Amino acid sequence: MSVKIITDSTSYIPKELIEKYDIRVVSLSVVINNKSFREVDLNNIEFYEMMNSTNEIPSSSQPSLDEMIKSMEECVKEGNEVLCIFISSKMSGTFSSAHIAKEMVLEKYPDARIEIIDSATNSMQMGYEVVEGAKYAQEGSCMNDVIDKVINVRENSRFLFVPHTLKYLQKGGRIGRASALIGGILQIRPILTVENGETTIFEKVRTKKRAIDIIVNKVIEDCTKKEVGGIIVHHINCEDEGRELADRFQSELNIPVNIQSIGPVIGVHVGPGSIGVAYFTL
């Protein structure tokens, strides 16, 4: 019996990998100007232009229960076991909703196997858990081995990023422990990371340039101690800056490094101009 993986839209996995490994994606939504939009249906550039044209800070919401149930049922009806990997339970109610959906599907298909993992993060730090798990599943690995691989990636990965401005962190609301620190660091540029499922501060510096230098040095330090499993540069509407950072990593590590835009659900909390990197080691 094959293992199929379901994730959510905040993994920001490149489309070609979603198609290659047959990954199912359920979409979170954003609400702006009293209108709700599924993240997967949004054009990033247009959304951030819309966000900049209003004083309202958009909010985000978890995938609908119906979409969760439909995705799980489709996988089960195809004769698969189902592994769900979702955004940190401390950042969204998606993980909790998935358990409700699971119980409803199991009422209809009591012999099905559905497992749900808290990625404890978002963006491609979560995406790597999903992609590596999907690779294992496609190679014919059993559910327990796929889960072990996902957990291994989770434990050997990191996401470092720096916002262009603190405005969205101050107003956004869902940034974990970082929110308690913002008031005292208004003159500081924070390098953010995710630890124990929450956004927190990795280091505080004075300029974005210095922040990027520190991020590069940390990534190189980690990736020279161990073999690199994967690395991707994330950006929010600053593609040229993202490509420049990716080229820098390629030069230093001698491996291909792609770039991937972060969508609105995470972007509303850090804002346009944010840049960072997600990576894992073997």
Set out the residue ranges of the language-model regions:
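Glycine-rich, highly charged phosphate/nucleotide-binding loops
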Residues: 61-71
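Glycine-rich phosphate/diphosphate-binding loops that line cofactor/substrate pockets in enzymes
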Residues: 70-82, 219-228
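Short glycine-rich anion-binding loops that position phosphate/pyrophosphate groups of nucleotides
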Residues: 87-91
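Glycine/small-residue-rich loop that forms an oxyanion/phosphate-binding "nest" at active or ligand-binding sites
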Residues: 84, 105
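N-terminal glycine-rich anion-binding loop in soluble enzyme alpha/beta folds
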Residues: 4-62
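Glycine-rich loop at the start of a catalytic domain that most often binds anionic cofactors/ligands
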Residues: 43, 76, 97-100
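Mixed-charge interfacial surface used for oligomerization/domain docking
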Residues: 3-4, 11-18, 23-24, 29, ...
